[in-house]
Amino acid sequence: MHRQHILVVEDSDEDFETVLDAARRGGVSRPIVRAASGGECLRQLRATPRHREALPALVLMDLNTPGEDGRDALREIRNDTILQPLPLVVLSASANPRDLLFCYTHGANAYHVKPVEHALHLQVLQQIFAYWLASVVLPA
């Protein structure tokens, strides 16, 4: 059983707490690591040993973070041959069709709009975790 972590790129403390709550409620036992920006995400990934077992099982990415944002991180991850296979799910407040097109064009595996209502936000996160961590087969 893999104990790979989940990397959550989220600048909002409240939204990060919602991620942790959804993981607890969904029985997610993997460690959850936070990066507050796309730039911090890239620094963490580049500092990680370059083998599959050390990389995250899932990257959950907010687009609009300070400094280097989620768009920058998405581009860099998909241009790196070691990081490229990482499952990357965007969870953003933006429903702008340009953001969706950008993310899918640059290799996001999925795009979810963050619900405003807390209960729905929890539900979406639990569905993401169930699908990406329990249902699909990920690269080894």
Residue ranges: model-predicted function:
Residues 71-84:
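Short amphipathic alpha-helix used as the core "switch/output" element in two-component signaling
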Residues 40, 116-129, 136-137:
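C-terminal output helix
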Residues 34, 65-68, 97:
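Residue-level signal for the "D+5" position in two-component response regulator receiver
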Residues 61-62, 92:
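Active-site residues of response regulator receiver
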Residues 3-24, 59:
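Conserved acidic segment of CheY-like receiver
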Residues 17, 21, 71-72, 95-110, ...:
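Alpha4 helix (beta4-alpha4-beta5 surface) of REC/receiver domains from two-component response regulators
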Residues 34-58:
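Acidic, metal-coordinating helix/loop segments flanking the phosphotransfer/catalytic sites
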Residues 10-11, 91-95, 115:
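Conserved active-site segment of CheY-like receiver
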